[in-house]
Amino acid sequence: MSGHNKWANIKHRKGAQDAKRSQMFTKLIRELTIAAREGGGDPESNPRLRTAVENAKAANMPKDKIESAIKKGTGELEGEELTEIMYEAYGPGGVALLISVVTDNKNRTAQEVRHVLSKWGGALAESGSVSWNFERKGLITIPKEEVEDIDELMLLAVEAGAEDLDENTDPLEIITAPENLTQVRNALKEAGYTVSEKLTFLPKTTVKLSDEDAEKLLKLLNALDDMDDVQEVFGNYEIDDEVMERLAANI
């Protein structure tokens, strides 16, 4: 599993333990609104919104709150003026980071991001110096125990438009072009697989971190995750699973 996705899973578990429901709901509501504003209010034709709705339901967000957030994105209801920004940064060990934020105050958020990066061994980067190393992709995951024939799954996924399948992860990861995410997801669901999906940024090259730099980076990622305006952080780091689990337990 890539470093980013492994950390995302650990972060999800931590979030449930920390019970930061208010902050979590704020982030989910903003993602619903931005996703609807970007691609329309129909989850079936808008994969980003579909993922946002699934995440909101998984967090037990009331249906009326989900619908209200979507309508604010489509303009059916008035809402706060939100801006989506992608900051480029470097972290410990030379790791490249993309920091996705949604904010109602760009100046405040820029100062907060800069402060957190500086405190934990990172720094903002010039525009383009980090983003070149990432590609926008669709990511579908399937529980490994559901798959009896990996070759059959791979053939089905490729015929539906997938680019790659990583069988060395659990859950299995299937990569698609963003525009093919929906059709691949539909083909897999029709075949009876349990799928989770999202749009993500995947690195073209990765950096293997020492234990020391890995610990610094996870502290930085944790601090960024704790910011109200930060939606997600993408990185090109590699950390051994055992090391990440051990370090994350102490953060």
Swiss-Prot record:
Subcellular location, record wording: Cytoplasm
Residues covered by region (Disordered): 1-22
First-listed, main subcellular location of the protein, grouped into a coarse class: cytoplasm
Gene Ontology terms describing biological process: regulation of DNA-templated transcription
Key words of the record: Cytoplasm, DNA-binding, Transcription, Transcription regulation
Disulphide connectivity of cysteines: none
Pfam families given in the database record: TACO1_YebC_N, Transcrip_reg
Gene Ontology MF terms: DNA binding
Keyword Repeat in annotation: no
Endoplasmic reticulum recorded as keyword: no
Gene Ontology terms: cellular component: cytosol
Family the UniProt entry places it in: Belongs to the TACO1 family.
PANTHER family from the UniProt entry: TRANSCRIPTIONAL REGULATORY PROTEIN YEBC-RELATED (PTHR12532:SF6), TRANSLATIONAL ACTIVATOR OF CYTOCHROME C OXIDASE 1 (PTHR12532)
Protein name: Probable transcriptional regulatory protein Pmob_0807
Species in which this protein is naturally found: Petrotoga mobilis (strain DSM 10674 / SJ95)
